[in-house]
């Protein structure tokens, strides 16, 4: 849940309901971004489309507002005291259903400040390394573990590193599988958001001059692209260097079958097998 788009009370009630319906199967991931690609969409997500976009606030203001909302969400979930500045009487609000707790809460981030927030609140932390140097993920998770403060007895650091990965029969095949997503990234950053296209169209696409400039600036060092053994080795090395407890992969493809096949190739390379059907 991108918390700036929702009220903490709304999120608390939604996820308590989900936790009631599917006990043990729900996690609540919380992020600071709105997910919007432009100011007008961002305003529509938060204040409604009838309002002009609010003037951009500084990063510290955004961070402080998010931290307050996150603390309020945890308080509505019965996990914390309400933060200073919360509405009078907030602690008396009856959050429904009131006989089930919030599911486990994870903070998603990509910066040192997010790592510090997760550590200060004693939350599990999922750090995305998208479009970034993998060394930043290693440093971010080191900072998280170093600063971790348990909120309750038994709490301990739990770190996830989030990566983009495309696994083909070989590197050339993997690069082709990644081409629709990378094209969409370039077009979005150039101001022309577009859906994923089939591989053959992505490979044949001719970039405009502005798009070429954007593509040249993209830092794709954190992407895992290659054959099964190559990606398995890269993934294992990063997991060991970062000390991650879990790895989460994002594999956006035009064809769903390509995504499934990519996961299957990597699973076989690292020795994972599908669980037996119930």
Per-region residue spans from a language model:
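Conserved, mostly hydrophobic/aromatic
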Residues: 18, 118, 174, 238, ...
């Amino acid at each position: 849940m991108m918390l700036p788009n929702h009220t903490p009370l709304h999120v608390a009630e939604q996820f308590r309901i989900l936790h009631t319906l599917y006990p043990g199967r729900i996690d609540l991931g919380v992020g600071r971004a709105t997910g919007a690609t432009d100011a007008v969409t961002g305003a529509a997500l938060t204040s409604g489309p009838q309002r002009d976009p609010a003037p951009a606030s500084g990063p510290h203001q955004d961070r402080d507002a998010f931290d307050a909302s996150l603390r309020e969400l945890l308080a509505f979930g019965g996990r914390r005291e309400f933060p200073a500045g919360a509405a009078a009487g907030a602690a008396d609000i009856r959050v429904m259903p009131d006989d089930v707790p919030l599911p486990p809460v994870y903070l998603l981030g990509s910066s040192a400040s997010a790592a510090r927030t997760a550590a200060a609140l004693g939350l599990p932390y999922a750090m995305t390394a998208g479009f970034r140097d993998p060394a930043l993920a290693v440093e971010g998770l080191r900072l998280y573990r170093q600063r971790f403060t348990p909120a309750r007895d038994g709490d301990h650091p739990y770190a996830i590193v989030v990566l983009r990965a495309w696994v083909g029969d070989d590197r050339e095949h993997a690069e082709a599988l990644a081409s629709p997503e990378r094209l969409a990234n370039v077009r979005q950053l150039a101001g022309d958001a577009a859906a994923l296209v089939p591989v053959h169209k992505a490979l044949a696409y001719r970039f405009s001059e502005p798009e070429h400039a954007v593509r040249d600036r993209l830092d794709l060092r954190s992407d895992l692209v290659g054959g099964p053994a190559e990606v398995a080795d890269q993934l294992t090395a990063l997991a060991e260097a970062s000390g991650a407890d879990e790895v989460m992969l994002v594999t956006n493809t035009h064809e769903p079958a390509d995504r499934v096949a990519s996961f299957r190739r990597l699973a076989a390379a690292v020795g994972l097998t599908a669980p037996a059907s119930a």
